[in-house]
A protein has these predicted regions:
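Bacterial N-terminal signal peptides that target proteins for export
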Residues: 23-34
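Generic detector of N-terminal low-structure segments
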Residues: 13, 27-29, 302
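An N-terminal assembly and electron-transfer interface module characteristic of large anaerobic redox
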Residues: 50-545
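Sec/Tat signal peptide C-region and signal peptidase I cleavage site
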Residues: 45-49
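Bacterial N-terminal signal peptides
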Residues: 34-44
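Short, Lys/Arg-enriched N-terminal segments with co-localized hydrophobic residues
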Residues: 1-21
Length: 545
């Protein structure tokens, strides 16, 4: 039933958002933006930030969503308060929306702002948004609770939601169980569904789409489409709230995505119904896991009356025209959007920019996974050119944050080996090369902007944490242990470490420590690693010294 219902639903233009944005609200947003810009002109970015307290409801307890966010902001003397751990989603359970509501209302009077994941308050977390069986009535009840939040909490609310992802394949417990077997078919089906919605489906593709439908169990495909329809309705309600001023700022993130997919299609629907809304109030962004830190950076900048400027500097080659994996937008479109989301503006030149966002991209514009055979510790001519430019910038005292996005899910080994051996990386504001390009870019912007208010010691700890995680672990230690597990037909352990967790942890710690000892920037660093979700995909890096 839901197969046809979903097709019918998404075929309608989503244009029931209340018409053109109310003039009064739009004027208020533009007036606020003008006031912030004026303040930025009168106040230098380097002013000492005042002590802030921000309530933060994360997507779940993964380090990139929780611990790393808290550590980043507290390094800049900003107090971040999270709900008790037992209320936050983990790899084994959903979060507790009702308990988080109560916690928010109790803590709000003593905070300056709140940054909230609506997925946590509606579905119980990111994985919950992909696997829930919550009724439409209950979802509407939770959205209504959100609607009242503005009057309940006397502070600025920054919120973010997600459009359910459409992965090519997925294993583990982060999707419905059937996705591990029919995921590729669902992805192919969603691509054709997107083309059909745009009126571009050929007769041959229509037959393929029908064949895919026949070869999947109706109950399983129907379950997936039903959940998508429910979540799309929730996002439409949330954008209405943003239009009516219920949030100070609201963003929707497109999780693992492609230029043809259900995620892309639903993003297009929402874009059509919100085209008239100011980007000072609402945005649709690529990527999800970086949004918590990105919105906190926005709250931080606005609270301190600053609107810093960011200049994107690309390595030689495709650069801004690169289309990353897991994204439906080229960097020339997605990077400026994330700069805006952080409460900053894009500079027209590097000369007077408060932050230079250096982006290491593949010369040919083709992004591969960090496990690719060519991700070796040998620098290309393009690498050498970009390292030379970065060295000049750092030696001249410029504020530089590096997004290493030539590969997905880890660092560019050739580029980073040359960089770490050629120049002093201590002055670098931030480094990020984790997960998707959009994740890494968002973190690089946020950490780069916040670094101005950190001590050199605090900044160094965060820098070394990311180098150990994104470079040493993701591109090397994880790759090595994955290859070994596959060789012994134990690929299952990548998604559930089970009884081998201790042995694998010892091996990856030794590998990361060996690499740390090889480079001056990390030599002597004391750190521990752990597997917060009992799988290989992510580690928690804790810097001891």
């Amino acid at each position: 039933m839901y197969i046809n219902l979903y097709k019918t639903y998404i075929s309608r233009t989503v244009n029931n958002q209340g018409g053109v944005c109310m003039a009064k609200f739009t004027f208020r947003c533009h007036k606020l933006a003008a006031a912030i810009c004026t303040a930025a002109l009168l106040m230098p970015v380097s002013v000492q930030a005042k002590r802030l307290t921000i309530l933060y409801v994360p997507l779940d307890n993964r380090p990139v969503c929780s611990a790393y966010v808290k550590q980043t902001m507290e390094a800049a003397n900003c107090k971040i308060i999270l709900p008790p751990e037992k209320y936050i989603a983990t790899n084994e359970k959903n979060g507790n929306p009702e308990a988080i509501w109560d916690w928010l209302e109790h803590k709000a009077p003593k905070a300056d702002a709140a940054v909230i994941s609506t997925d946590s308050l509606v579905y119980g977390g990111l994985v919950g948004s992909r696997t829930h069986n919550v009724s439409q009535e209950e979802l509407q009840k939770r959205v209504n609770h959100l609607y009242k939040l503005k009057t309940t909490l006397p502070i600025k609310l920054y919120a973010f939601s997600t459009i359910m992802r459409t992965p090519r394949a997925s294993k583990g417990r982060v999707e419905p169980p059937y996705y591990s077997t029919i995921g590729p078919s669902i992805f192919a089906y969603s691509q054709l569904l997107d083309k059909q919605d745009q009126g571009k489906l050929s007769p041959a593709e229509k037959l393929t789409m029908q064949a895919l439908e026949r070869n999947m169990k109706k109950a399983e495909l129907g379950d997936w489409l039903e959940r998508r329809e429910k979540n799309l309705l929730v996002n439409q309600e949330l954008t209405r709230m943003a239009r009516n001023g219920k949030f100070h700022y609201f963003a929707i993130g497109k999780d693992d995505n492609a230029t043809l997919s259900a995620t892309h299609m639903e993003g297009r629907k929402i874009s059509l119904s919100t085209f008239d809304m100011s980007r000072d109030c609402f945005q649709i962004l690529d990527g999800v896991d970086q949004l918590g830190l990105l919105l906190i950076a926005r709250a931080y900048n606005e609270a301190n009356g600053t609107k810093p400027s960011v200049y994107p500097l690309y390595s030689v080659g495709a650069g801004a025209s690169t289309l990353p994996q897991y994204s439906d937008a080229r960097l020339q479109d997605s990077v400026p959007q994330q700069i805006i989301a952080a409460g900053a503006v894009q500079a027209q030149s590097a000369d007077n920019a408060d932050l230079i966002l250096a982006l290491n991209t593949p010369q040919d514009g083709i992004v591969k996974d960090s496990t690719a055979d060519d991700n070796q510790p040998f620098a290309s001519a393009g690498n050498k050119n970009f390292v030379g430019i970065l060295g000049q910038l750092l030696r001249s005292g410029r504020n530089v944050s590096l997004a290493d996005i030539s590969y997905s899910n880890g660092a560019d080994n050739g580029f980073m080996s040359l960089l770490a051996n050629s120049i002093n990386l201590q002055p670098l504001a931030a480094y990020n090369g984790w997960n998707t390009a959009d994740n890494a870019v968002g973190y690089a912007i946020a950490q780069g902007l916040i670094a101005r208010d950190m001590s050199s010691e605090a900044r160094s700890r965060l820098l070394r944490q990311r180098l150990i995680d994104d470079w040493f672990y993701q591109s090397n230690a994880r790759r090595s242990i994955s290859n070994e597990l596959e060789k012994h037909n134990r690929e299952d352990l990548k998604y559930d470490l089970a009884t081998e967790e201790k042995n694998i942890l010892q091996q990856i710690t030794a590998d990361c420590q060996s690499m740390a000892n090889s480079y001056s920037i990390t030599r002597g660093t004391k750190f521990t690693l752990s597997f917060p979700w009992k799988r290989l995909f992510e580690v928690d890096v804790e810097i001891k010294k």
